[in-house]
Amino acid sequence: MAKMTSAYANKVLKKLNDDKNYYLNMEEEGQVYVAAVDEEPVVPDYDYEVVSSKIAEIDEKIVKIKHAINVVNATNKIAVGDSDMTVDSILVRMAQLNKRKMVLDKMRKRQEKTREKYGYLNARKAAPEYQYINYDLKLVGKEYERIDSEIASMQIALDKFNQTFEFDVEC
């Protein structure tokens, strides 16, 4: 067993994926070679069994680390505001809030009244047309700020947890 934090585990996963890509590239480049009939072939240094076993070994480590992270995320609660939430529920909630924040951001940037653009169909109309918002702009702005603040507090709690909470990973 090895002790890791989520932050460290993600760095290890990045390294393992880089290593795996190295062996996948080696496999891709070493599978075949071209040689002219009248010259000595230059055979790439490639051993299927060695490369395949390295890839399988790396994949096994990745599975163990990701499983440990998933268990930690599903079973450990973090205080966020005045409630406790599991890490995985925080991640889901943050995704929901970020989508809502994008909608509210678009709404809060609208003008209360805008003139419609003239186009081919509007060219014959004498009176200009206006588009009006159908909501309270200040309320939307406040809701945007509230959601932004909620996301920030979740992110801070999550960052602290990821940097400090240690868990066991099977080696």
Roles of regions detected by a PLM:
Residues 1-171:
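Structural preference for solvent-exposed beta-strand-turn elements
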